[in-house]
């Protein structure tokens, strides 16, 4: 099962992005720094397919390694001259250690967000909308069998000529039932981000994913990472690609939570 899951994870980038690679426009009108800042805007007018791999070290009671590959297609849709809807879907492919020394591999729960955002924003940009957790997990060790729903909000500042891009994305998801495997849940995600862009598409970045499990005891509730990394825009033929590598240390975590996370991301970009 593990080999099949890993083979699927490695094959998906080619399956999803192959048709675009063959016919992607040059986008010569956008420089590397502009492309980098566009990639850093969660509600930008940009079709993209990020593949984000998170390796969590010293996870679980046996302090083993957990790996999560998030496949995260982003699709903006124009609904009028003034408004866009930006859909963001996260499908996790998980390799999870089990307490008995075994390991399970498969798909976790899908998280879908639809942001309503101004089509012509100023320096300060925002988007708001619902977030839905869909129980797509392939087994009970990788997710919850109850649907979830909640609000999501993103705000950021992005100005032409300014190397800084910063903001935050927050959501909270409540389970709609407690009857399925895993029971009810109430989880928050807070992702502040800050980027400093250099000429040529090189940038420094920090985007820790802070989480809170409101149903856990207070001492086990929060995961708070600190860290950062580096990113670069390059091209595969005519296709812009955003590559990023970063590391985060959890200064606060549950007893069974990991202490380090290594994040590697490749984002295929299709600017409109």
Regions found by a protein language model. Give the residues of each.
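Cleavable N-terminal export/targeting peptides
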Residues: 1-32, 272
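Transmembrane beta-barrel domains of Gram-negative outer membranes and organellar outer membranes
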Residues: 28-272
